[in-house]
Amino acid sequence: THYALVGTIAASKKYMTKLVVSKGYGLGIFLDTIPGKMQGSEENMPAMLQRCKTGDIAFVKYELSQEVFARLWQYLQEYQEKGYDKLYNGSNQPLNGGGAGCSAFGVSFLEVGGLKDLFPVDDWIIHVHAPEKLIGGPHHPGHHVSPIRLFFRNRWADEKKEPYCDITYYDPTVMFNQIELKYKRGFHANNISGMQTGNAFGFLIKCADRPAPTVPIWPAKR
């Protein structure tokens, strides 16, 4: 029997702050791969139980076949063996070793398990136009962005008026809001039903009859 309650975070919040405040990364902090680490059940379980009490969490639970679970477990082990758990942010493409935030890391399990189509997870994606002049760090060498400029900028780039860089990511707040909204509206399907744990809303997806994908877990490198 295997069990894991894992997530990825930045290895040091102080380091991230330093990159923005002292190194002038600006919005480039969302594009750069920075040191990360994986948190396990001993850290995540108390937080999850507390959030279930307060309702500050939403969830989607999948009932899997043993075959699919074994594939996901293999993915988790190999992800750590490759050292990808130490890469945070970046391109948010964990299967390509490009780094990942917590949300992209979670969704990657749905991709590996062939489960992504069972729930409208693409509704959680956010696309923004980051003004190029507010991007520093490796993506804009030699360009230092003052934190003050970030503080007073309250909008994304106007694509018709200024250069920009596209940033795409799974937004945790959107994930929470979408799941809770669907629950309250009574969203359901043949294999999907709403459920509640404490004061937390979510869904149960019964998909134990779905076979594991036959394609390799890791995409071929080009």
Locate the predicted segments by residue.
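A structural motif
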Residues: 61-85
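Activation targets extended, charge/polar-rich intrinsically disordered C-terminal tails
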Residues: 78-222
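Non-membrane alpha-helical secondary structure
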Residues: 37, 64, 68, 164-171
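Active-site-adjacent helix/loop patches that line small-molecule binding or acyl-intermediate pockets
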Residues: 49-67
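Glycine-rich catalytic cores of cysteine/serine-nucleophile enzymes that process amide/ester linkages
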Residues: 1-50, 221-222
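Exposed alpha-helical structural elements
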Residues: 43-47, 67-75, 174
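Generic structural motif recognizing short loop/turn segments at the entrances and edges of beta-strands
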Residues: 1-2, 25-27, 55-60, 163, ...
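Solvent-exposed, acidic/flexible segments
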Residues: 27, 38, 65, 69, ...
